[in-house]
Amino acid sequence: SRFIKYGAQPKSSLWFSEQRQILRFDFIIKFIKRNSPPGQFLINDIGCGYGGFLKRLEDNFNIDSFSYAGFDLAKSPIAYCNRGYARKGAQFYFSGIPLETADYNVMSGTFNYAPDIKFKAWKGYLFKSLYSIWNLTRRSMIFNLMISEEERITSQSICYIRKETVVNFCQRNFGTTYEYFSSKLPREITFCVCKT
């Protein structure tokens, strides 16, 4: 597995550049800072990998100000996170879907890699997953996707979708949808969908 080969670093989760990963996390954190309720908030990190987002949260928030639950379908990273990062207020689970409702449901890179699947099936999976997660969201659902005018899955199994496809789906089915873009991540957009 990639985790066994590379250990707890971005390479093991297909994010080859730590700087780019931090940029992704910082978009999410900036949005949470602007919109977080007074008092403690709860975050579900779906597709948490080796726990990088939790570390970034702890760099930006007092650990008493939030509770964190990380979810992943890969056993090795979850075992690693449970050994190294689990504490009161930060738990990790071998599961693809959160166990309870959270203020923020975060998916950083969760939907970008899809081996052995056609685009139409992946898109159906993406939208079905967003529906499920929206029902477990109190304030906002935040996720990033690879964007292109040509919707496709590459030979490296990376999924690209049109920005308008995502925005239209989210506005029609969920709520106000904000987009965050950086020239340093030219093919990605972070979407923040808010409950009113």
Model-predicted segments: where are they?
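N-terminal, positively charged/glycine-rich alpha-helical extensions of SAM-dependent methyltransferases
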Residues: 1-10
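Conserved alpha-helix/loop element of class I SAM-dependent methyltransferases that forms part
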Residues: 20-38
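Class I SAM-dependent methyltransferase SAM/SAH-binding core
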Residues: 44, 52-92
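A short SAM/SAH-binding and catalytic strip from SAM-dependent methyltransferases
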Residues: 104-123
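Conserved beta-strand signature within the Rossmann-like core of class I S-adenosyl-L-methionine
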Residues: 137-145
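Short alpha-helix
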Residues: 158-174
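Core SAM-dependent methyltransferase catalytic element
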Residues: 180-196
